Amino acid sequence: MRFVVTGGLAGIVDFGLYVVLYKVAGLQVDLSKAISFIVGTITAYLINRRWTFQAEPSTARFVAVMLLYGITFAVQVGLNHLCLALLHYRAWAIPVAFVIAQGTATVINFIVQRAVIFRIR
């Protein structure tokens, strides 16, 4: 349940910043998604390490998380771009593409963090 709450909070940070950067600031869509993903994942990592998994700081774990986030970064930005293109960048496509990209990355993150990363000492 803690992972879901943490993911929800990080998702709000990610989506909120994405919309502000893309729609309000006028940044290019992939750059907006990239920046919002980075801020959202840093938020998620800090909360997950301290609250969700209650893990002590670890250099090995930090490196593993950064590698995982690098992979999910590509998944997120790529899926978001693909979905927006397939849906012709309509206004309603923004949250749809975000949910698909975020949902896919969240599943990958949870499985790898639970099974591998937070078992590292």
Curated annotation (Swiss-Prot):
Periplasmic side: 24-26, 83-91
Signal sequence segment: none
Subcellular localization, as worded in the UniProt entry: Cell inner membrane
Cytoplasmic side: 1-2, 48-61, 113-121
Transmembrane segments: 3-23, 27-47, 62-82, 92-112
Primary subcellular site in the record, as a coarse category: membrane
Bilayer topology annotation: Multi-pass membrane protein
The organism's place on the tree of life at top rank: Bacteria
InterPro entries: GtrA_CellWall_Glycosyl, GtrA_DPMS_TM
Cellular component aspect of the GO annotation: plasma membrane
Induction conditions: Is cotranscribed with dprE1, dprE2 and aftA.
Phenotypic effect of disruption: Cells lacking this gene display impaired growth and abnormal cell morphology, since they are shorter and more swollen than wild-type cells. This phenotype likely stems from the decreased incorporation of arabinose into arabinogalactan observed in the disruption mutant. The mutant also accumulates decaprenyl-phospho-arabinose (DPA), the arabinose donor required for the synthesis of cell-wall arabinans. The lipoglycan fraction comprising LAM (lipoarabinomannan) and LM (lipomannan) is not affected.
Transmembrane keyword on record: yes
Oligomer status and interactors: Interacts with the priming arabinosyltransferase AftA. Also interacts with the galactosyltransferase GlfT1, which initiates the polymerization of the galactan domain of AG. Is thus probably part of an AG biosynthetic complex.
PANTHER family attached to this UniProt entry: ARABINOGALACTAN BIOSYNTHESIS RECRUITING PROTEIN RV3789 (PTHR38459:SF6), PROPHAGE BACTOPRENOL-LINKED GLUCOSE TRANSLOCASE HOMOLOG (PTHR38459)
Family the entry assigns: Belongs to the GtrA family.
Name used for this protein in its record: Arabinogalactan biosynthesis recruiting protein Rv3789
Origin organism lineage: Bacteria, Bacillati, Actinomycetota, Actinomycetes, Mycobacteriales
